[in-house]
Amino acid sequence: MYTVMDYLKYYRDIPFTEVSLNQLDFLICAILVYLPLNDFKEAKSLKDFSKIALELENKDYDGMMIPKSYEVLKYLQNAKRYANMKIMNFVNLKNEKTQFGACKFLMDKKTIIAFKGTDGSTIGWVENFRLLYDYPTYTQRLSLNYLEDNIKFNDKNVYVVGHSKGGNLAMASVMELSRPLFKKVKKVYNFDGPGFLKKEFDSLKYRELLPKLVNIIPTGSVVGSLLFNKNYKIGRAHV
């Protein structure tokens, strides 16, 4: 079965001028945001970002995606394709109210904003269940605030992505943006994340989101099939 690691092994040194930025590059951003770093604002090179992250690797962390994020980072850190990547405004928040993470990437003259999915914490799973009966949740409101703060006046090519719960946050935050900021978003990539309650699914805001929305779920997905959504691409590739 094709994985993101297969993509990295083949394309890691192929520049964007030869193979354009695509959904697997966006998936890589959605994986890197799981790394257990402390918050930072200033832009970091991939080299500096990798150094900080790898120093924290052997600590005890919640979540199945953290080992995968380190696997991807190790293969990515010296890749020519991503040599000019910048990472900034990293948020890794967990308290009694929320488990929330986000990060902004600059790559190939594009802005990519990635939202973190659920880790192994209790509050992270509680939030997943809240999606079944509440909108907007506290974390969805945080994602909107983050997006509003990170789309700049001169941004023209903004992509918003996320895996699992992060995919839902990507959709919800773009859906609730003011129209001037909404127009700056080119695409929203939801990688195996749940949809919406029926009221939001039937709303005008959701219908306006659809032309920008790509939902990618692997065969046999459970989380990505929850609630109401459209524009599915069923794939055989896995994270």
What does each model-identified segment do?
Residues 170-179:
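Short glycine-enriched nucleophile-adjacent loop
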Residues 161-166, 170:
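Gly/Ala-rich beta-loop-alpha elbow adjacent to hydrolase catalytic centers
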Residues 1-2, 6-21, 29, 34-39, ...:
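Alpha/beta hydrolase fold serine-hydrolase catalytic domain that processes acyl esters and thioesters
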